[in-house]
Amino acid sequence: MELSFRLPNKKEVLVKELLFKDLRNFSLYRDSTLTGAIKFLESFICTKNLNIVEKFLTLLILREKCIGEKIGVNSKKGIVNIDLEYIRNNIGTFEDIREEITIDNIKCVLNYPSKFNIGDTDFVFSLIESIELEEEKILIPSLSDDEYKAVINKLPKEIYSYLEQFINKNKVHFEVTAFKKREKLDIKKIELNVLNSSFPSFIVHIFNCITDVEYRELLFVLCKRVVDVSFLINSTYLEIQDFYKLYSDETIKENES
């Protein structure tokens, strides 16, 4: 099943539903590398040519719709549940920073990067949204990894200074506040820089909602009532939580009668 919704910048996006079985697969990626984990999550975004800010907002909404609208945050009172809407409100809307430059008759449009920083310094070239030479236009986000490397290797060396200037000029737009400091609960302020590896790490963290052991335990319990395992693993985690609550309530009533 596919879901569609509109981002704050009015762009329509399409995503694949994140199912219970996908969370088990995600746990395997999550425990290996950041690269594998973030690429796995990106695979659920059907809409092409998004920048990482749009991907971030898309994944927040996907998480809300398929896993739940709350995430646990450490505080002096233990784990506190925070609404994802609270995070989205803190972040607000991202300013349009698109800028066009020309180097050696090559027109380049600069914008938020289309690749996350997962340790590969070449990601910085994804600040280039498109390249136009004569009548040929190349959309950088649409390129495969090999095509991307081939294109950036042919760029004039002067592009480095332009990218550096662009980053410095828009520094404030690359920084977002996910959580504001809340002294009563001893919740620390969490700031993210979209150009830093902490940005994709935060995204991976909010999808970290179940362990492999918990996955098997939930299946074992629910299979006592729903014998069709395929139905369960092809449900969302949000639905699984509802099924589990119904089963628990039913069991309590049976024990009381």
Residue ranges and their predicted role:
Residues 1-257:
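An amphipathic, hydrophobic-aromatic interaction surface with interspersed Lys/Arg
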